[in-house]
Every structure is written in structure tokens, then in C-alpha cells.
Design a protein with these regions (language model features):
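Alpha/beta enzyme core
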Residues: 1-175, 182, 189, 223-233
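Extended, intrinsically disordered, low-complexity segments
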Residues: 177-233
């Protein structure tokens, strides 16, 4: 996870990266290590949740939860890791308690996390616009994050709608994955049925390499007086 986070964070360090830290990958010591490693990787923010290590997607049913005490221990470990590392990583406290334990328990967990030093609250599985507005109001002035998952248990909100309800951060975890999955499925189906692969404008090897930094590599080599690309690419 640290390696992947570091690779993404350093594609463009000027763009802040929010990373999923799941459960912290273990007890308080592992949470401490996870947060420390994410800080060293250049991650700008992470979210930490209250499911057990054998967790499931927040938009599936019958999720299990750890106790509030264990959850807050994770948050405390994350805050301590940030202090010890002299980092400024933003800590997002997530709870999945809404579905099984109800609204009041979920809010209690988030308020406890905020008291310990969490910077942002994340109530997974908000069930309606009314509930969304309610949680944003209940946790003021702490920023609240909305998880935009089309077809999930939460309402489909535009950026403007989410802002109007009081959310201050929105994540779109399936945006790229769903687009890529659909495109790959279509391409493989065409190959299987016709024996040919899709050919689209702007899909040459050079175009792909440009997306992943070919021109930046050329510029860096040229600036250093290198000759790797002097005859072109």
C-alpha cells in the first residue's frame, strides 16, 4: 500500500492525494505504522474506519464493526503517529455504524474521533439528503466528507448538491474504475466475437506513453544535456 500510495502521490506532488487506510491493517501499532508510512509516501490525507480487518465495501449490507473503544484507539494511534512524525497529514475518521447501529451511535463515534484530533468526519452510507444535511449540521464546524458511489446506498448527488447540503469534501472512488472496466469488457468482447481489437484515434503507443510521462522524460533529459532522445522518439 505504501508503495502504491507513494507512486500516485509523486505523479504530481502539487495535487493532494487522499488515500484509503481501511482499518489501519491491524491493531494500534499497525495503525501507527500505516499512518507513518503514508506520511513518508507524500499522502495528503487518509481515512480510517471502524470495521474489522476482514472488512467489506461500505455499500454492501451486513457489515461487522469493532467496538467504539477499539475504533477510537485506532484514531488515537493515527493522531499520535502524525504528531511523532511532525507531519500535517489530514486524518479522516470514517464510521460504517449507521447501517447496523443507527444514526446516534454513528455520530457518537465521529464526535469521539474529532475530540481525539481527527480533522474530517466521514459517515459511510448516508441514506438520504435529509440525513446528509443532518450529519453536516451535527458535526459543525468539522468538515464532513461525502462518498459518491453511483448505485450505492447513498443518494446520487452532484457536486453542487453535496455542497448545498453541507459537505466540504467529495470522493468518487469508482469513477475511473467503472469507466476502465466497461471499456476493457467491451474491447475483450469485440476481440472474442470478431477476432479484431478496437482501434481508436489517439490510441497509439506514443499517445499512451505521452499520458504516462514521455514528454516530461524527454524534457528532463534535454535539460541535463543528455542525448537519449536527440534523434526523436
Amino acid at each position: 500500500m505504501r508503495g502504491t500510495a507513494e507512486m500516485i502521490a509523486n505523479l504530481d506532488p502539487s495535487v493532494p492525494l487522499i488515500a484509503d487506510a481501511d482499518t489501519g491493517f491491524g491493531g494500534s501499532l499497525m495503525v501507527h505504522r500505516t499512518v507513518t508510512e503514508y506520511i513518508r509516501a507524500g499522502v495528503a490525507a487518509l481515512h480510517l474506519e471502524d470495521q474489522p480487518i476482514t472488512k467489506r465495501c461500505g455499500h454492501l449490507s451486513n457489515k461487522q464493526l469493532v467496538s467504539e473503544e477499539e475504533y477510537l484507539s485506532r484514531i488515537r494511534a493515527a493522531v499520535n503517529a502524525r504528531c511523532r512524525s511532525n507531519g500535517d497529514i489530514v486524518l479522516i475518521a470514517r464510521t460504517d455504524a449507521l447501517q447496523s447501529l443507527g444514526y446516534e451511535e454513528a455520530i457518537s463515534r465521529l464526535k469521539g474521533a474529532i475530540e481525539l484530533g481527527a480533522d474530517v468526519a466521514f459517515l459511510e452510507g448516508v441514506a438520504s439528503k435529509e440525513q446528509a444535511r443532518q450529519v453536516c449540521e451535527a458535526l459543525k464546524p468539522t468538515p464532513v466528507l461525502f462518498n459518491a458511489v453511483p448505485g450505492g446506498v447513498s443518494p446520487d448527488l452532484s457536486v453542487q448538491e453535496a455542497q448545498d447540503l453541507g459537505f466540504r469534501i467529495i470522493i468518487f472512488p469508482g469513477l475511473a474504475l467503472e469507466a476502465v472496466s466497461t471499456a476493457v469488457r467491451s474491447a475483450v468482447k469485440q476481440l472474442k466475437e470478431t477476432g479484431t481489437q478496437p482501434v481508436r484515434a489517439g490510441s497509439s503507443p506514443r499517445d499512451l506513453f505521452n499520458v504516462v510521462g514521455l514528454q516530461e522524460a524527454v524534457a528532463l533529459d534535454h535539460a541535463a544535456g543528455g542525448k537519449l532522445y536527440e534523434k526523436g522518439v
